[in-house]
Curated annotation (Swiss-Prot):
Stretches the record annotates as Disordered: 121-144
Lineage: Bacteria, Pseudomonadati, Pseudomonadota, Alphaproteobacteria, Rickettsiales
Keyword field contains Translocase: no
Positions of region (G5): 486-488
Organism of derivation: Ehrlichia chaffeensis (strain ATCC CRL-10679 / Arkansas)
Annotated tr-type G domain residues: 340-510
HAMAP family: IF_2_B
Region G2, annotated ranges: 374-378
Protein name: Translation initiation factor IF-2
Record has Transport as a keyword: no
Region: G4, residue numbers: 450-453
Family, as annotated: Belongs to the TRAFAC class translation factor GTPase superfamily. Classic translation factor GTPase family. IF-2 subfamily.
CDD domains, sorted: IF2_eIF5B, IF2_mtIF2_II, mtIF2_IVc
Region (G3): 396-399
Length: 842
């Protein structure tokens, strides 16, 4: 191998070759100095040509010997590396080698052409003009280049542009050729065919004769760059082709899939695109063509437009009736077996009659001490265990007038009502209201006469008073059980429990257990650590952790956790069981129903349907807008804007109900926002924008929020008792009322003499009959019991002195701004005074 290397070097460097055209493989092995520094000339003798030819033959033989060794070594290394290459990389490498071979063939063709040109030129005419030779030389070079390019296109279509440019630069030969011999020079095709066969043979030998020890570092930097670019371009083309084929196959498969789309009454653009597995922008483009230009992904489409879009994308659709969906959900499980359930008992009565204390005595707890001032302001739900694994669910409702909605909610979910009446107070307004709720709900009732331990307790008086409201006790021949109890002394509590169980037995309370759960929301609130917390009572089915529930028209979610009345975590809740549920997205209203659905998608559809019904009901009950004439006729009415924040949703409803009853013709109360939770910065900013006050009931305000409210001059009022908030709202509204102004007659003047009457007014001499006259007082000029002038006393004098007032029994002179004729005999003057009366809303 070393010998072959030395032969190559000696062959390349021996002698001074002043003019030669080497093959590409020869040029790659020349040093950069020789390649760049040698200048060639065509004007040489025939002897020089022969010497050059002989040297060139030696060089070619040496180069061919060396190239065989190098090619064998390259083939070996190629085979060795091909084992670790992918098929695509091997193909790219083969293309690069083929491009290099084509370049070598081009060099050989140019060399043969150059030699022939030299011989013809030197034997014919050396003295031809330089300009003609250059012209003919360019024509010859162009034809040779065309032939080379055609040959290159026949062998491969991936020739590098850099290689072609290199060939064109090397083809700028300085030979002088006569135009008459050009056609003869380009004839020898046999030589080209032989060389092509030779290189094909060499290329085949590269694949099968691997030899080690010979370096393949025979390419210049330029050719290496060309080969690398060829490999990179081929890889890119293959990758792009692969991607395009993959995309075409994916799109073709996608277009073949036909989906069945469920279309509700209303659906958003985004939901419709998702159900069809289409892009949102494609659906928007289709709507744009239909004339819906400014439509967003969150905009709703009716079923007609949605069905047209589905058909345009070659899908099928089915219209869904959400009302039918809700009916089917509630009808689920009606044909299944009914099993006994625990009774739900609601404790009702007037405020301070001992309802919560009675429940504490039964549960052996102390809830009443936790209430502010001992007043219940929330609905509480508890379940107690009796002997024999029997359970009773109790619901404690507030007794204040403001909690009418809460009491109505309690009667809607209850089986039995325990009406608590204080033995010392007797029948009170909220007692009567509770009786009416019981009658409206058509539920059973037990009367518990509390506080019988007091000395002035009179049970017979209460029993007779109940007759006036249609409640007949068993002692009087009726069907209402009356139990005298004492929560404080724990008297007759067992008798009350037994009466409840007896009543439940008579009612034969049963429910389906093995079905989707449904029930009622008793109370709801926002907890800082847990989020939305809702107290539910299951009326049908079994509620499990992980179920998806829909509550009312604005709330749904997945049940993350459940807790019983004792605070222990529960996995399931059976009928008549109260639980606190975490996981809802919004705070539901008290008294709203809940039901378990199959999926979040179904939950959203049901919420959308209920929201639509709710909005339609609001529009139907909305008051008609007043036109400009009506507003002018009614006059300007002052408004008080309120932002209400409470601890639980039941309190929000109770306070809104109470303050809505505070009305006045000259002022209007607007509850701009009501919610559950602490006062936040957004509440303060809303109050600043709307000029509102913030009423906070049983909630706190952070220091940062207080500081912001102080900067914005926003008033935040905190309350713990519902009485206080109602009274305070009345005071605020009363302070906004303008005082009522009335005209009161404070004196009378009789006219004695008219001194003058002109443009400045009338000067009258008068006598104060009664009352008192003051300067600037309002006066009315009365003639024959008719008011002919109203004005003010501009000047008041006694004799020649200006005075501020004149009492009864004295004479005075006055100046009125009245220029018409006055008759002293019949005209009298009434002295008036405006008195303001402060109005109070009661």
């Amino acid at each position: 191998m070393n010998e072959s290397k030395s032969v190559v070097d000696s062959g390349l460097m021996s002698g001074k070759i002043e003019r030669t055209t080497l093959k590409l493989s020869d040029k790659l092995k020349l040093s950069s100095n020789i390649h760049q520094g040698t200048k060639f000339s065509l004007k040489k003798s025939v002897t020089t040509v022969e010497v050059r030819k002989s040297k060139k033959r030696k060089d070619i033989n040496n180069i061919e010997q060396a190239s065989v060794v190098l090619q064998n070594d390259n083939a070996y290394q190629d085979n060795e590396s091909n084992n670790s290459l992918t098929i695509q990389e091997q193909i790219s490498r083969m293309n690069a080698l083929q491009n290099a071979n084509i370049c070598e063939k081009k060099e050989d063709i140019k060399e043969d052409t150059s030699d022939v040109n030299l011989q013809v030129t030197e034997s014919t005419s050396v003295e031809k003009s330089e300009s003609d030779d250059v012209t003919l030389e360019e024509e010859s070079s162009k034809k040779v280049e065309e032939q080379v390019v055609e040959e290159a296109h026949d062998n491969t279509d991936t020739v590098s542009l850099n290689v072609v440019e290199n060939v064109q630069e090397e083809s700028q030969v300085d030979n002088q050729v006569e135009s008459s011999n050009i056609s003869d020079i380009l004839q020898p095709k046999g030589i080209e065919e032989k060389k092509l066969k030779k290189y094909e043979k060499e290329h085949e030998e590269k694949k099968g004769n691997p030899k080690k020890g010979v370096s393949n570092n025979m390419y210049s930097k330029h050719v290496k760059l060309v080969i690398e670019e060829e490999l990179e371009d081929n890889n890119k083309q293959v990758i792009q082709t692969h991607k395009s084929r993959k995309n075409r196959s994916t799109s073709s498969v996608k277009n073949k899939i036909t989906r069945k789309v469920l279309i509700p009454k209303k659906i958003t653009v985004q939901e419709l695109a998702s159900s069809m597995s289409e892009r949102v922008k494609d659906v928007q483009h289709m709507l744009f063509q239909m004339g819906r230009r400014d439509i967003k992904p969150t905009d709703f489409l009716d079923s007609d437009h949605a069905s047209v879009i589905v058909e345009a994308f070659n899908h099928t659709f089915k219209l869904v009736n959400d009302g039918k969906l809700e009916e089917d959900l509630y009808a689920d499980g009606n044909d299944k077996e009914l099993l006994p359930r625990a009774p739900v008992v609601t404790v009702m009565g007037h405020v301070d009659h001992g309802k919560t204390s009675l429940l504490d005595a039964i549960r052996k707890s102390n809830v009443a001490d936790g209430e502010f001032k001992g007043i219940t302001q929330h609905i509480g739900a508890y379940q107690i265990m009796l002997d024999g694994d029997k359970r009773i669910t109790f619901i404690d409702t507030p007794g204040h007038e403001a909690f009418t909605a809460m009491r109505a909610c309690g009667t809607n979910v209850t089986d039995i009502v325990v009406l608590v009446v204080a033995a010392d107070d007797g029948i009170m307004p909220q007692t009567i209201e509770s009786i009416n709720h019981v009658k409206a709900a058509n539920v059973a009732m037990i009367v518990a006469v509390n506080k019988i331990d007091k000395h002035d307790a009179n049970i017979d008086k209460i029993t007779n008073s109940l007759l006036n409201h249609g409640v007949v006790a068993e002692s009087l021949g009726g069907d209402v059980i009356v139990v005298p109890v004492s929560a404080k002394e724990r008297i007759n509590l067992d008798q009350l429990k037994s009466s409840i169980l007896l009543m439940a037995e008579l009612l034969e309370l049963k429910a389906v257990y093995d079905t989707r759960a449904s029930g009622v929301v008793i109370e709801s609130k926002v907890d800082r650590n847990c989020g939305v917390v809702a107290t539910l009572i299951v009326q049908k089915g079994t509620l499990k952790a992980g179920d998806i529930i829909v509550v009312g028209h604005n709330s749904y979610g997945k049940v993350r956790n459940m807790f019983n009345s004792d605070g222990r975590s529960e996995k399931v809740a059976i009928p008549s069981m109260p639980v606190k549920v975490l996981g809802l997205n919004n705070v539901p209203n008290s008294g709203t129903n809940f039901i378990v659905v199959d999926s979040e998608k179904q939950a959203r559809e049901l919420i959308s349907y209920r929201q639509e019904l709710f909005n339609a009901e609001l529009e139907a009950n909305a008051k008609p807008k007043m036109d400009a004439n009506s507003i002018l006729a009614c006059g300007v009415v002052d408004e008080l804007n309120v932002i209400l924040k409470c601890d639980v949703m039941g309190s929000v409803e109770a306070i809104c109900y109470s303050i809505s009853k505070i009305t006045h013709e000259d002022i209007k109360l607007n509850v701009l926002y009501k919610g559950v939770g602490n006062v936040t910065k957004s509440d303060v900013l809303l109050a600043e924008t709307s000029n509102s006050i913030i009423l906070a009931f049983n909630v706190k305000t952070d220091a940062s929020v207080k500081e912001l409210a102080k900067q914005k001059c926003i008033e935040i009022k905190h309350y713990s008792v519902i009485y206080d908030i109602i009274d305070d709202v009345k005071k605020i509204l009363s302070s906004m009322l303008k005082p009522l102004q009335q005209e009161v007659q404070v004196g009378t003047l009789s006219i004695r003499k008219v001194f003058s009457s002109g443009s400045i007014g009338s000067v009258l001499g008068c006598y104060v009959t009664n009352g008192i006259v003051r300067k600037g007082a309002l006066v009315k000029l009365i003639r024959n019991n008719n008011v002919i002038h109203e004005g003010k006393i501009k000047v008041l004098r006694r004799f020649k002195d200006d005075v501020k007032e004149v009492a009864a029994g004295f004479e005075c002179g006055i100046l009125l701004d009245y220029s018409k004729e006055i008759y002293p005999e019949s005209d009298i003057i009434h002295i008036l005074e405006i008195v303001e009366e402060i109005r109070v809303i009661k």
